Amino acid sequence: DAIHLKINAGFEHSLALGPPRAGGLEVSSGPVTLQLDRWSAARADGLKIRVRESLQGQGFSFDNPHAPPPVKQMSVQELRAALDRGDKLWLFDVRGDDERALASLPAAKPWDEDAIKLVDGLPADATIVFHCHRGGRSQAVAERYRRKGYTNLHNLAGGIDAWAREIDREIPTY
């Protein structure tokens, strides 16, 4: 058997044990054989694989120098300071019209077809901040753009709920 390493275009890594396959790249060290397809091999240069312990047991962690940086969490205080300074950033509200009608940040653009086209045309290193109610949906949108190669992505930690509680108490919470 061989260990098959796959690294997809989003730099998600997977390991599987199975029979050796023809083609691709093969690396052996003693009794262990690692196989990669040609696309994974191109993404694996410099890859470090480590065994880690967690509450769920042992697993693997991957440190890939070619992977785009993770989505950064931006606090509401950091966003306010950036807006006050006039920093060049793009702020998008990924919630639907119904939620934006309840509470909104004036500086945020709604996440619609026009916003998607705008972001798709921005440089990969543009500062882009996504927000939603509490941060879950905006994190998912940011991760989508991370997989597309964008490198300066931020999720507003706590979303508009945190903004309303910590920055502007006149914005309603829901």
Language model feature labels by segment:
Residues 24-25, 119:
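Short, surface-exposed secondary-structure edge patches
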Residues 38-46, 55-90, 96-129, 136-174:
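Rhodanese-like catalytic fold shared by cysteine-dependent sulfurtransferases
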Residues 8-10, 134-137:
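Gly/Ser/Thr-rich loops at beta-strand to alpha-helix junctions
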Residues 30, 92, 134:
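Single, functionally critical "micro-switch" positions that shape active/binding sites
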Residues 1-24, 32-34:
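Short, structured protein-protein interaction patches enriched in aromatics and acidic/basic residues
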Residues 1-2, 28, 95-96:
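Non-catalytic interaction surface on structured domains
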Residues 8, 94-95:
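Short, well-ordered beta-to-alpha junction loops that form the rim of enzyme active sites
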Residues 25-52:
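N-terminal accessory interaction module
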